[in-house]
Curated annotation (Swiss-Prot):
Belongs to the BetVI family. PANTHER family: OS08G0374000 PROTEIN-RELATED, STRESS-INDUCED PROTEIN SAM22. The gene is BETV1D. It comes from Betula pendula. Keywords: Allergen, Cytoplasm, Pathogenesis-related protein, Plant defense. Brassinolide binds at K55, Y82, Y84, N101. GO terms for molecular function: abscisic acid binding; protein phosphatase inhibitor activity; signaling receptor activity. CDD domains: Bet_v1-like (cd07816). GO terms for cellular component: cytoplasm; nucleus. It is found in: Cytoplasm. One of its GO terms (biological process) is abscisic acid-activated signaling pathway. This is Major pollen allergen Bet v 1-D/H. May be a general steroid carrier protein.
């Protein structure tokens, strides 16, 4: 098994605490509403949202995958940190064992925040991660973030 890691940082004008509430803590409800072209629904399979929770994320018709299952590994409300692993569906299968993801939202002096995202692809055997997989993952994350950000800018009373 090999591990391929990539890290990205992206900024938002939304304060860290507000973005964490909307994007992370209530993302299962909010994201399908604001980005139905990317995620059609999220089902809680087991757990209460904390570590060990299993979620099924369903994608709309025409998407390359029908679903993925995520396992929540850590939710740190104080440091705005969220770790989860993609354990089934999507790209996980013959060549990938899982994808571990860490999101940390850090406040910036201007009142916005920086999202620091680390993704670790755990491959099976000698398989390598394709550049297209990484690109698609980055684009999906950016799409979801910008949809949530737009919603929060349009609804200043939400998630305060």
């Amino acid at each position: 098994m090999g591990v391929f890691n990539y890290e990205i940082e992206t900024t938002s004008v939304i304060p860290a605490a507000r973005l964490f509430k909307a994007f992370i803590l209530d993302g299962d409800n909010l994201v399908p509403k604001v980005a139905p072209q990317a995620i059609s629904s999220v089902e809680n399979i087991e757990g209460n949202g904390g570590p060990g929770t299993i979620k099924k994320i369903n994608f709309p018709e025409g998407f390359p995958f029908k679903y993925v299952k995520d396992r929540v590994d850590e939710v740190d409300h104080t440091n705005f940190k969220y770790n989860y692993s993609v354990i089934e569906g999507g790209p996980v299968g013959d060549t990938l064992e899982k994808i571990s993801n860490e999101i940390k939202i850090v406040a910036t002096p201007d009142g916005g925040c920086v999202l620091k995202i680390s993704n670790k692809y755990h491959t099976k055997g000698n398989h390598e991660v394709k550049a297209e997989q990484v690109k698609a993952s980055k684009e999906m994350g950016e799409t979801l973030l910008r949809a949530v950000e737009s919603y929060l800018l349009a609804h200043s009373d939400a998630y305060n």
